[in-house]
Each structure stands twice: as C-alpha cells, then as structure tokens.
C-alpha cells in the first residue's frame, strides 16, 4: 500500500514514510492509494487487539505483521481496563461508544497509545536514526494523549501547544503536570486555529527543516493530519458494529448510523474509511457545537473559516479550520489539483466552494447538525434524568444532533469521546447544580451524582506539581522548534 499527497499525487510514500513524516512537503495530507476490502463479518468475531491488528495491517503493509499483532495486543490491554471499544446501551436502539476508558480519558488514546510504537518501528523500517521532534497543536485532548504516549520514548522530543483559556482546567492540568524528560508544553495566545496554523507553518518552512536537519533532527506530527493517528481510529467502528451483531441487535449487512462530535474531522473520517472497507455503515452524522463551520459546509458546499469564534463548554470542538476535511475532498473528487486549489483559496481568502456534484457525493454518506450551549446543557440533563446516563459536553453535542437525525429502525451509535469528569463544572451546571470554582471539588460532587468514582488518573492531578507555565505568541512556535538540539 502506497500513500500520496492530497495536493500532489506524484509524491508517493510508504506507510512508514507517511507516519514518520506526518505532512507532505507541499502541505498536503497523505492518503492511501486505495481502500482495502476486508471480510467485515469475519472481523466481527475478533477481540479488540486482534481486530486492531487485522485492520491496521491492511494499510501498514511495510510493517511486519507480527510486530503489529504484538503492538496492538500490548496497547489495548490493561491500559483500557478491559473496555476498549465499549458500547453502552442508552435508550432504545441508541448507543454510546465509550472511547474514554484509556489512560487520559479521551478517544485520542486509541491512536496515541499505539502511534509511538508505529513511529519507532517506522524509523527502523526506514533505517533512520535521527531525533524526531513532534509538534502538536491541541484543543485539549490530543495534547495530553500525545504527551502520555510519547513521554520518555528514546529518540523523540515532543512539544505541545494549546490555546490559552481554550481548554478545561482539568485538560490544562493534564498537560501542565506531564512527566517525562522529553516533553514540553506551551500555552499559545489565541485560539486552537492560531496554534494549529503556527504548527503548520513550521512544517511548511523549508529553512527550519534544513536547519534542524543539520542538527540531525526531523519534524513529525501527532495531530490527526498524520496518517498514524487516523488508522487506529477505524478499528472502533468495526468494534461497535461487532458488538451489535454479536448481541443479536442486528444481522450482518444491516446498516448502523454513527453520530460523531466533530472538530478536526479525523474521527468521523475514520468511519468513512471503515465504510469504504466494507463495514455496513449507513449515515455518518457530523455533530458540531456553535462553531458550526462544518454544518454550514455540509449543507451548502461553501466552507467559510472567517467567522465569529465561540469559546464553548466543548472546547475540543472549538475549531474553525477542519484539517481532515481535505482528505475527504480528495477521495470524493479524485483530483489533487482541485484540492490544492481549494486549500489555496482557504489560505488566501478564508473560504472555498466545492462543485455541486462534489457536495451531492458527500451528502450521500454524511449528514450534519449542530447544538447550542443551551441545548448541550439540556442534553446532559436529559440523558442523566431519563436514561441514568452521564455524559460529557462533547458527547452531549452528538446526542442532541443524533436525536434529530435518527432513522427509524436503524441503530444509532453516538461516539462518546471524553469522560464527563474532564469537564466537571460544565456537567454539574448542566445538571442544574451550583458548581464550585475548584474543578476537583466539582469532580467530587460529580462522583456523588454519577454514583461512582472519577477516573484515578484525573483525581490524581490534584496532587501533581505543575511543570509548564510558559505562554507564547503563535509566531514563537518556530522559535521553540529551532531551540532543539540533537
């Protein structure tokens, strides 16, 4: 399996190269040359680690299959507490795919616990011995998951950049207290898009790359622009379908719809890949918060990033430039020149419009909707009072949209992307309770409401010392990168 850039089909690489490099030289994203076809029904009989190995090996064809089997087995075992890809019934034929039972309590763990192993193996496959400098822009969850996955990995340095005031206090503390000799964390003045743009500029700066190469350092990414982030996320769509099949809720071939709280479009795009591989996915429902740029695009075909930015209670979705949409545009149009033109228009004008036939093709699979802050709070309370189910703010966005888009007789799986204990004040307030200013006091009150303890890794943050408190401007991200030595 080869990969090529969404903006230049002539730039072909192996999966090892795609994972080690992260982003194509001209700024495009790597996509597979084809969609491998699998026996989805047979895969439904596997446990999660074996299922993960079976899916990722279809794309990572230059990796030793034995390595992938061992890597997935060691990744999705104890760290996920026996709940990797756990599907919880909520109401009728609506389910929650709980993706927050990993070490950092967010869905990003599924990729970022495996991805460090993939990077180290990629360098071995390529015969590369240089230091890898990973730059990560985060709206909250990716940063901690990447830090946890990559800390103290030999030959790797990682720097994470998050927007000041753009995460929950628990998310900030998860990053600021991170242990490890090879990690660094910076708050960036501005929003997530400012941080992400700053990181992308570093990746696209040939002078920076040349200077780092002199020091035997190469840049890479742990954001979902890196193929190594996307491929592990395909797996849990198969896992959700398998659980419904094995429980007798569906027969093989029945469609299942998925509603995904969406920011950077990577998680929902993984569902598109699962569908293209042969999994009977029906509709993929893109759920946005008040930063509803994707809802507008999927409705009109015009993407407009120049708009008011809202800080919401679902900060991991507070994004106006949704990077992975570029991959979908390539798959639908099949044209690197067309995609390059659209991305050029976005960079220069802040917007682009796709052809009507492109929008129609996208709408065959993708539906969309968005939730206001009031609706998010109402959804948290409704699920708690009506279904005895406690969810976080991002999941509530998806529950609200899922109810609007639910098809009669078709199961709906809502991707639950983070633990409610990562956002204790917002969840408590949604339940109609007065939340204390201190997040840990709020967490204790939420434990009483939930009837069970908060994840140990979150509760332990209260005792940890903060290591990182530097605040920088987006333009200083380049200075940070150039400050590294081999």
Residue ranges and their predicted role:
Residues 1-486:
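PLP-dependent amino-acid enzyme catalytic core
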């Amino acid at each position: 399996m080869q990969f090529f850039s969404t903006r230049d089909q002539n730039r072909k690489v192996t999966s090892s190269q795609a994972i080690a490099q992260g982003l194509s030289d001209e700024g495009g994203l790597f996509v597979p040359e084809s969609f491998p076809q699998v026996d989805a029904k047979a895969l439904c009989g596997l446990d999660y680690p074996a299922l993960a190995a079976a899916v990722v090996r279809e794309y990572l064809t230059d990796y030793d299959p034995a390595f992938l089997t061992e890597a997935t087995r060691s990744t999705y075992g104890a760290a996920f507490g026996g709940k990797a890809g756990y599907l919880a019934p909520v109401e009728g034929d609506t389910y929650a795919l709980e993706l927050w039972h990993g070490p950092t309590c967010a869905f990003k763990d599924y990729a970022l616990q495996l991805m460090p192993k993939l990077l180290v193996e990629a360098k071995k496959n390529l015969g590369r011995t240089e230091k890898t400098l990973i730059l990560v822009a985060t709206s909250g969850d990716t940063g901690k998951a990447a830090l946890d996955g990559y800390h103290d990995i030999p030959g790797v340095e990682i720097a994470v950049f998050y927007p000041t005031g753009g995460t929950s206090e628990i998310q900030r503390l998860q990053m600021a207290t991170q242990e490890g000799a090879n990690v660094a964390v910076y708050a960036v003045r501005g929003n997530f898009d400012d941080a992400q743009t700053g990181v992308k500029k570093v990746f696209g700066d040939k002078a920076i790359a040349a200077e780092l190469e002199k020091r035997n350092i190469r840049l890479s990414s742990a954001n979902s622009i890196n193929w190594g982030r996307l491929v592990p996320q395909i797996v849990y769509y198969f896992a959700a379908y398998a659980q419904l099949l094995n429980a007798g809720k569906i027969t093989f071939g029945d469609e299942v719809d998925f509603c995904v709280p969406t920011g950077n479009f990577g998680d929902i795009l993984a569902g598109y890949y699962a569908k293209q591989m042969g999994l009977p996915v029906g509709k993929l429902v893109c759920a946005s918060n008040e930063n509803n740029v994707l809802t507008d695009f999927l409705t009109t075909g015009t993407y407009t990033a120049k708009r008011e930015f809202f800080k919401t209670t679902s900060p991991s979705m507070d994004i106006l430039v949704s990077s992975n949409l570029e991959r979908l545009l390539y798959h639908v149009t099949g044209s690197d020149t067309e995609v390059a033109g659209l991305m050029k228009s976005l960079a220069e004008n802040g917007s682009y419009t796709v052809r009507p036939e492109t929008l129609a093709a996208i709408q065959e699979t993708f539906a969309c909707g968005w939730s206001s802050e009031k609706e998010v709070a109402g959804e948290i309370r409704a699920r708690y009072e009506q279904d005895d189910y406690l969810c976080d703010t991002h999941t509530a966005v998806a529950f609200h949209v899922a109810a609007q888009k639910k098809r009669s007789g078709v199961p709906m799986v809502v991707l639950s992307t983070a633990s409610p204990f990562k956002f204790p004040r917002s969840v408590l307030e949604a339940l109609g309770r007065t939340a204390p200013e201190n997040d840990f006091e709020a967490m204790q009150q939420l434990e009483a409401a939930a009837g069970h303890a908060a994840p140990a890794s979150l509760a332990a943050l209260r005792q940890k010392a903060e290591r990182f408190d530097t605040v920088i401007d987006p333009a200083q991200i380049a200075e940070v990168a150039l400050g590294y030595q081999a």
